[in-house]
Amino acid sequence: MNLVNNFSKLFPRCLTTGLYLWSLYAIVVCIHVIRARVVLPLVFTIAMVALYTYAKLIYVGPGTTKEYSILRVYDLNAAESGFELPPEMLVKRSYTQKRNGRFRVCKSCSSWKPDRCHHCSTCNVCVLKMDHHCPWFAGCVGYRNQKFFIQFLIYCTVYSILVLILSSMEIYTWFKGEFFEVELINFTLLSLWLLALVVSISITIFTVFSISQVCQNQTTIELYSLRRYNEEVAFLNEFSNEPIKGTINIFDLGKKLINWEEVMGYSLIEWALPISRRPSSLDLEGSHSHGLFFNVNKNVSKTMNESVDLQDRLLRRLTPRSSLDVDRSNFV
C-alpha cells in the first residue's frame, strides 16, 4: 500500500518536471528561427522559476488542522452531543456551522474544523481553506500554498504560449521553405507543437478560472456549495409567502483587488515572485496568517444573520426533523 501511495505521488510530480525538461531540450534542438542567445535565456528562466514554484507548492503544503493542537477533539461523542466545546476564540470568529447549529467537527481527524476547512479523503487530512485536490502534484491546494499554485498556473500559461509561438514559427518556416518536398517534419518539433497547443489552451482556461476565483475570494468547494445552497433556497421559496434571499460569498470583501491581496500579497513583488505573503494590518490579530480565521464582508454577514430566523421558521414548517435546522451561513 505504501508503495502504491508513493508511486501515486511521485508519478505526477516526475511527469510534470519531465515535461518541462523535455520541452527545454526540444527547444534547444529544434528551434532555429530565432537566435538561441535571444530565446534560450528567456525560456530557461521562465521554466526554472515555474519548477521552483512547483517545488515550493509541494513543500509548503496547504496547511492542516493537525498543525494546531488547539483544534484537537478529545471525545468525538461529547463533541457531537455538545458536551465538548470548541475553543472560544474559534467560535467567536467563525461563520460556518453544521445544519443543526453545532460547530463543525471531523471524525476522521478528531479535530474542530475552522471556516473554509474541509477533509480531503485522498490526503486523509483536514485542509485549511481547502480549494481542491490537484492530481498534477498529488496534493491539496489550501491556505498556505494557494498563492504558489496561482503563480505556477500563470508561469505555465506564459511558458506554454511562448513555446507554442516558437514551435509554430519553426513549422511555418519549414512549410514556407517547402522542405516538406525533400524531408519529413521533425518528429520532436511536431510533438513539441502539439503538446504546447493542448497545454496552452487547457491551462489558460483553468488559469483564468482560478484567478477569477481568487478575485472573488472564493474556493472551488465554496463555489459548488453556494450553488447547491441557493438551489435549496429556491426550492424552499416555492412553499413560502416570505421568500428567502439567496446568499453570496461572505468572504468576498467587495473589491477584486482586496480579494486578490488576501491571497497573493500586497505588493507587485509578492504577486510576481514565489515568496511568502507578508501579513498586513488587516489581518485579525495575526490569526489570518494561520488560516484559522478570515476577514468577512460585514454587509453580507449582517444580511445573512437577519434572514436566519425566517429561514429557520420556514424549514420547521416544512418538516419537524431537527436535522434540517439551519444556523447562520451553513452553505459551506
Curated annotation (Swiss-Prot):
UniProt free text on domains: The DHHC domain is required for palmitoyltransferase activity.
Compartmental location: Vacuole membrane
Enzyme class: transferase
Organism from which the protein derives: Candida glabrata (strain ATCC 2001 / BCRC 20586 / JCM 3761 / NBRC 0622 / NRRL Y-65 / CBS 138)
GO molecular function: protein-cysteine S-palmitoyltransferase activity
Gene behind this protein: PFA3
Lumenal-side positions: 35-37, 169-188
Family that this chain belongs to: Belongs to the DHHC palmitoyltransferase family. PFA3 subfamily.
Post-translational modification: Autopalmitoylated.
Protein name listed in UniProt: Palmitoyltransferase PFA3
